[in-house]
Amino acid sequence: MDILIISLKSLGYSRTHKSLDSGPLVVHAVAGAGKSTALRKLILRHPTFTVHTLGVPDKVSIRTRGIQKPGPIPEGNFAILDEYTLDNTTRNSYQALFADPYQAPEFSLEPHFYLETSFRVPRKVADLIAGCGFDFETNSQEEGHLEITGIFKGPLLGKVIAIDEESETTLSKHGVEFVKPCQVTGLEFKVVTVVSAAPIEEIGQSTAFYNAITRSKGLTYVRAGT
């Protein structure tokens, strides 16, 4: 565990007051904070670590084991579970739990370490996320492209993500192909359009909105309200 804690501190994670003797090590980080990248480097440098995820696993590689689906843990290895908040029945076999609690807050635990800074999310999008009530900031130098209009006052471009049932119904009636936020967890797209039946000022601290808008790594469009 010492290697992991040293790594977290070097990456800028902040320590809470929770005792390290209380259960598995819990680590929280916002979208784009480099959590998965840090875990990949950890298992590449230290073969005694095993990392599983309840999200999207890495593709098979000849260079490294990568982040895998939950399965057997080699005897003596330090086991880490990423995206632990997606299920509360799988975590007992692991010594450390990682997640972005904003993606599934109902199953989140009190953390030992946390990181509120993204390195991927553009400034305009980060400001919008923070304005919706999330503790979120970014170190990205990209201003980014963010456009906010009513649902039918702008084109629906790229990956269209509907964040509520009313917007799903509206898009279906017009024959628009879309996905739900839960279908794109851990994925990123160059162009994303987030569709909400409620206007942007009424969305608030919505898990669905957070999951949707943080999938964009390029052009971001929000079609909210009428």
UniProtKB/Swiss-Prot annotation:
Keyword Ribonucleoprotein belongs to the record: no
Cellular component GO terms held in the UniProt record: cytoplasmic viral factory
GO biological process terms held by the UniProt record = symbiont-mediated suppression of host innate immune response; transport of virus in host, cell to cell
Alphabetized InterPro entries for the sequence: (+)RNA_virus_helicase_core_dom
Q: Which residues are in the (+)RNA virus helicase C-terminal domain? A: 116-226
Q: Which GO terms describe its molecular function?
A: ATP binding; RNA binding
Q: Cellular location of this protein? A: Host cytoplasm
Q: Which UniProt keywords apply?
A: Host cytoplasm, Host-virus interaction, Inhibition of host innate immune response by virus, RNA-binding, Suppressor of RNA silencing, Transport, Viral immunoevasion, Viral movement protein
What Pfam families does the entry give?
A: Viral_helicase1 (PF01443)
Q: Which residues form the (+)RNA virus helicase ATP-binding domain?
A: 1-115
Quote additional remarks.
Answer: TGBp1, TGBp2 and TGBp3 seem to act together for cell-to-cell propagation. TGBp1 is the main movement protein that physically cross the plasmodesma with the viral genome. TGBp2 and TGBp3 would facilitate TGBp1 function.
Q: Assembly state and interactors? A: Homodimer and homooligomer. Interacts with capsid protein. Interacts with host AGO1; this interaction targets the host protein for degradation, thereby suppressing the antiviral RNA silencing.
What the protein does comes down to: Transports viral genome to neighboring plant cells directly through plasmosdesmata, without any budding. The movement protein allows efficient cell to cell propagation, by bypassing the host cell wall barrier. Increases plasmodesma size exclusion limit. Acts as a suppressor of RNA-mediated gene silencing, also known as post-transcriptional gene silencing (PTGS), a mechanism of plant viral defense that limits the accumulation of viral RNAs.
Which family is this protein grouped under? Belongs to the Tymovirales TGBp1 protein family.
In Swiss-Prot or TrEMBL terms, this protein is called: Movement and silencing protein TGBp1
